[in-house]
Curated annotation (Swiss-Prot):
One of its GO terms (cellular component) is cytoplasm. Belongs to the DNA polymerase type-C family. DnaE subfamily. This is DNA polymerase III subunit alpha. The lineage of its organism: Bacteria, Bacillati, Bacillota, Bacilli, Bacillales. It catalyses: DNA(n) + a 2'-deoxyribonucleoside 5'-triphosphate = DNA(n+1) + diphosphate. Gene3D superfamilies: 1.10.150.870, Bacterial DNA polymerase III alpha subunit, thumb domain, Metal-dependent hydrolases.
Length: 1065
């Protein structure tokens, strides 16, 4: 047997560039019979290594490289598992090292785990004799071929391997530079570390003692460990009075079924079936464990989602409180979740509110023990973009070049360097000079290697034994992790549950809590009506900002066209709006509005597809069709569905024949059977799990219900979740204003870090103010809670410590209106800053001394700042306007002129704006033009004025005025902009509109009687303007008569209407 006993794979992170598949490929090509994986301190690569070896008839040997110490000296040591007990010892030894961040292993620690291991000390010198002597009674202790001779110790040839060929030695230097954040030495030739995979020819050229090579075979023969997959490692649930889990589960289920007062016989029949499947597969403990942790969450103020994935199709899950979706009511299939004909672990993923998810994990750790619960490792890899920058950095590329590299590699998921090389600009960069070609060569060698570890976002492993008995552990940022990935840990047989954090659940929970506290209303989301017409009106208008699953522009558009009328419409939309099924949306909407257009290939499809108007949307429908036509069990139907989605031609052909034969035996003609099979094959690729759609649609409905009935609380919490994003905050503020919600400035006595809903509106968060950080807000709020509300500005200044009370902070708070409630103008308070800063005697904590020793502080009253300046400061400090901006205020007053906002204006429509910025530039031809920033009081937009227009309006732009602009909308650098063709002052535009209007449209006739004498039945001369009435209730326009524009009462007539009720066209 030829064996390599010291392979370091790429999972020896940033120490080896040898991928497992390359090591095995080289072993096959060199007729190597056995390989030992010996990464330093870790066992990350064991499962992949084992699978690759077995697939290629290579004997896998499990080992690890460690550094053993006696406190004075350290010796590199390779330990190999002789058997499965030794493998478990490796798990525990690696876990001890990683959990305790050990760089070296004491000889005592190694001795604890050495009974079932082979120990090979490397490069042993005289200074290491004491360490080796400790293991003199250990029969399987060796020294490598480079060690000194010690009586009684055998030597073995052992070659360290961490890259493929001599030409790959540069990868080790590059990885070391990346790891240590140093530069790569490109001047001198790269050192050959002598750690490449030796060929048989190279080994024969070495002068190796034959006895040393013989010992290689001896050791390889002794090692006989293997990974065991699909073990039964489910933890046992502790039941009351040591009752069996099966009996206890049944007792709990029947008790709950009776309590819910459902149609007992129907539900009992389904329950018996599910219970039998679950217990026959041995999963009763699993369901009790999941039920227990969800019960803990619900009874400890942690909101849990209604369900996730296919688990909502289980009645057992519903009765145990794991889900809140009744599978019989919603026609959900248990077999989509758990299939007796496809034995796999059940997979229940759980959504918790993201801010309290850790509470549940902590509960599980406390219940089962710290070493019994862990997260799961994931690996970050040196993918194309990452490796390109990393290698560029260590080669000394400047920031400009690194940015150029980033710009040349497309932002495409999974892109490779080979794909990037097909792009001409990238190829030119590579061949620009020899240095770039060297860079590309190193990048290619390192591409795809694992770079670092991180924590899987949701997966938690639970066992009633210490986990290191089954898998090695390491330490993550927040607790223990398995050293193996999610799929690897599950394949071993370990129980994995996904604890997912869902932001929307946190929002719902916070709204419910605030409504109960402020309004005394206890909303039970399980009892809200799911046929609320106000909710469906909201959805039909596409007013879904902030609504889970429904807030994208595309979904809004679908909702407006569909006009949902019941909950099933929401379920359908969330399922259809994805790549693939989107093409069926027009068909679904058309048939939904006109069911007479629904056609079925066969009448027996109608009961299955009636609720979706003949369109196959859900995976469960595919299973139902297979069951109805081909007499498949639901288990067989689920296997068919999976086969269809995988597109395996051989399997598909087999399943096609199976389906057609089944349908023929069931009395269906072969032609219709083939058509039905092709129909479900078309949809199998993107059919959506209905159980998941129903669960997530329930969250969407709940959020819609809260938005309709408690809008202040809804928007306050949505806003609190976008703190830090100026753009999203501004969008949400504008949306709330459109809904008629009053946005109140930050209030020093009401506001805190999050937005605060109230009966009057929403108080802005102090945290949104630029320059005011979280710690400052915490100090202010804590002081207010402990010692009561602030009496005035001076009281605030006295009670807040110096380290927080800076001029910058005080100015920011004043200018956004945080002290407005004290009744002093912002300009007055700005004037008072010097008093509180200059007169500060650092005796804030003693109010009595303050009053005695400090001169009485007095306000010097000043007139309020101009509206425009207030708006300017609010925009500067908040990113949006709280007070009504002068432009917006003028827009409200002048909207009768038929003017537009930037957000809803179309090409060449008049828009009321002010110019925030005018940047004049000179073109290559020496002509002047300008880039401008337009402000309509709500939002800003970039604009451009080309030379011809600029020459025409240059003098006008020098005035600080309000303007009406029009032009064509365009995109520049993927940003919307306006190419301005015409500019007028508002006064000029109004004058022309009044003089030359073609039509007057009114929406309110209450003022008409006062001007009855002005209105003529027919047009008598050119100055007569048609007067029309638009009835919004019936969406109809009628002509009332004509009014003469030259009439002395014309302006009075116009001004007598509310600006929102009249338009001049």
């Amino acid at each position: 047997m030829v064996a390599y006993l010291n392979i370091h794979t790429a999972y020896d992170l940033l120490n080896s560039s040898l991928k497992i598949e390359d090591a095995v490929r080289l072993a096959v090509s060199e007729n190597v019979d056995a390989l030992a994986i010996t990464d330093t301190n870790v066992l990350y690569g064991f499962p992949k290594f084992y699978d690759a070896c077995i697939a290629n008839n290579i004997k896998p040997i499990f080992g690890m490289t460690i550094y053993v110490t006696n406190g004075l000296n350290t010796v590199e040591t390779v330990v190999l598992a002789k058997n499965n007990d030794g493998l478990k010892d490796l798990y525990q030894l690696s876990s001890e090292i990683k959990m305790n961040a050990l760089e070296h292993v004491s000889f005592e620690l190694l001795k604890r785990f050495s009974n079932n291991m082979i120990i090979i000390f490397k490069k042993v010198g005289d200074q290491h004799r004491d360490i080796v002597q400790v293991f003199e009674t250990h029969n399987d202790t060796y020294m490598d071929h480079l060690s000194i001779s010690i009586q009684g110790r055998k030597h073995v040839w052992i070659q360290n391997v961490c890259y493929q060929t001599r030409q790959d030695a540069d990868t080790i230097s590059a990885l070391a530079a990346i790891r240590d954040n140093t530069k790569l030495d490109l001047i001198h030739d790269q050192e050959d570390f002598g750690a490449h995979f030796l060929t048989e020819k190279e080994i024969n050229q070495l002068d190796i003692n034959q006895e040393y090579l013989t010992q290689v075979d001896v050791i390889a023969q002794k090692c006989d460990a293997e990974l065991k997959y699909h073990q039964s490692l489910l933890p046992q649930y502790e039941t009351p009075n040591d009752e069996s889990a099966k009996k206890y589960l049944w007792r709990v289920l029947v008790t709950q079924l009776k309590k819910l007062e459902l149609n007992y016989d129907v539900y009992l029949e389904r329950l018996k079936y599910e219970y039998k499947v679950i217990t026959n597969m041995g999963f009763e403990d699993y369901f009790l464990i999941v039920s227990d942790l969800i019960h803990y969450a619900k009874t400890n103020d942690v909101m849990v989602g209604p369900g996730r994935g296919s688990s909502a199709g289980s009645l057992v899950s519903y009765l145990l409180g794991i889900t809140t979706i009744d599978p019989i009511k919603f026609n959900l299939l248990f077999e989509r979740f758990l299939n007796p004909e496809r034995v796999t672990m059940p997979d229940i993923d759980i959504d918790f509110e993201d801010t309290r998810r850790e509470r549940v994990i902590q509960y599980v750790q406390e219940k089962y023990g710290e070493l019994h619960v862990s997260g799961i490792v994931t690996f970050g890899h040196l993918l194309a973009r990452a490796v390109a920058r990393d290698v560029g950095r260590i080669m000394g590329f400047d920031e400009v070049t690194l940015n150029e590299i980033s710009s040349l590699i497309p932002h495409k998921l999974g892109i490779t360097l080979d794909e990037a090389y097909q792009i001409d600009d990238f190829k030119k960069f590579v061949h620009r000079n020899h240095r770039h070609e060297r860079w590309f060569s190193i990048c290619k060698k390192l591409e795809g290697l694992p770079r670092h570890t991180s924590t899987h976002a949701a997966g938690i492993i639970i066992n009633d034994h210490p986990l290191y008995e089954y898998a090695p552990l390491t330490k993550g940022d927040t607790g223990l992790l398995t050293q193996w990935t999610m799929t690897e840990a599950e394949r071993i047989g370990l129980l994995k549950i996904d604890f997912l954090g869902l932001r929307n659940l946190s929002i719902i929970h916070q709204i419910l809590t605030q409504v109960k506290k402020d309004l005394g209303i206890n909303i039970d989301i399980e009892k809200i009506p799911f046929d609320d017409q106000k909710v469906f009106e909201l959805l039909s208008q596409g007013d879904t900002t902030g609504i889970f699953q429904l807030e994208s522009d595309g979904v809004r558009s679908v909702l407006k066209k569909l006009k949902p009328e019941h909950f099933e419409d929401i379920v359908a939309v969330t399922s259809l709006y994805r790549p693939g099924p989107m093409e069926e949306i027009p068909t679904y909407i058309t048939r939904r509005h006109d069911p007479s257009k629904v056609q079925y290939l066969h009448p027996h499809l109608e009961p299955i597809l009636k609720n979706t108007y003949g369109v196959i949307i859900y995976q469960e429908q595919i299973m139902q069709i297979a069951s109805t036509f081909a007499n498949f069990s639901y288990g067989e139907a689920d296997i068919l569905r999976r086969a269809m989605s995988k597109k395996n031609r051989a399997v598909l052909e087999s399943e096609r024949q199976h389906f057609i034969e089944g349908a023929k035996q069931n009395g269906y003609h072969e032609d219709i059977s083939k058509q039905i099979f092709d129909l479900i094959l078309k949809f199998a690729d993107y059919g959506f799990p209905r159980a998941h759609a129903v669960s997530y649609s329930k969250i969407a409905y709940i959020m819609s219900f809260l938005k309709v009935h408690y809008p202040n609380y809804f928007y306050a919490n949505i806003l609190s979740n976008v703190i830090g994003s100026e753009k999203k905050t501004a969008q949400m503020i504008e949306e709330a204003k459109k809904q008629g919600i009053t946005i109140l400035p930050p209030n020093i006595n009401e506001s805190h870090w999050f937005y605060k809903p109230s009966q009057e509106g929403i108080y802005l968060s102090i945290g949104t103010i630029k320059g005011v950080g979280y710690q400052s807000v915490k100090v202010i709020v804590d002081e207010r809670y402990q010692n009561g509300k602030f009496k005035d500005f001076f009281d605030f200044a006295r009670r807040i410590p110096k380290r927080v009370k800076t001029r910058k902070l005080l100015e920011a708070l004043i200018l956004v209106g945080a002290f407005d409630a004290f009744g002093k103008t912002r300009s007055t308070l700005l004037q008072a800053i010097d008093q509180v800063l200059d007169g500060d005697l650092n005796i804030e904590q003693d109010g009595f001394l303050f009053d005695i020793l400090t001169p009485k502080q007095m306000y010097e009253d000043k007139e309020e700042l101009p509206d425009a300046l207030i708006s300017q400061y609010e925009k500067e400090y908040l990113g949006f306007y709280v007070s009504q901006h002068p432009v917006d205020k003028k827009f409200v007053a002048k909207q009768y002129l038929t003017i537009f906002k930037l957000s809803n204006a179309q090409n060449n429509k008049p828009i009321l704006v002010q110019f925030d910025k005018v940047k004049q530039i000179r073109t290559k031809n020496g002509q002047n033009m300008a880039f401008v920033t337009l402000n309509d009081g709500i939002e800003t937009l970039d604009g451009v004025i080309f030379p011809n227009q600029f020459k025409k309006y240059e003098e006008l732009l020098s005035h600080n005025d309000l303007f009406i602009v029009s032009g064509k909308f365009d995109h520049r650098k993927q940003q919307r902009q306006l190419i301005i063709n015409e500019i007028q002052t508002l006064a000029t535009f109004e004058e022309q509109k009044l003089a030359f209007a073609k039509q007057i449209i009114i929406r309110n006739k209450s003022q008409i009687d006062m001007f009855e004498e002005m209105i003529k039945a027919t047009k008598e001369n050119a100055n007569d303007v048609v007067l029309s009435f638009y009835d919004e209730t019936i969406k109809q326009m009628t002509t009332l008569g004509y009014i003469n524009q030259k009439d002395s009462m014309f302006n009075n007539f116009i001004q007598s209407f509310n600006p929102s009720d009249i338009r001049l066209i």
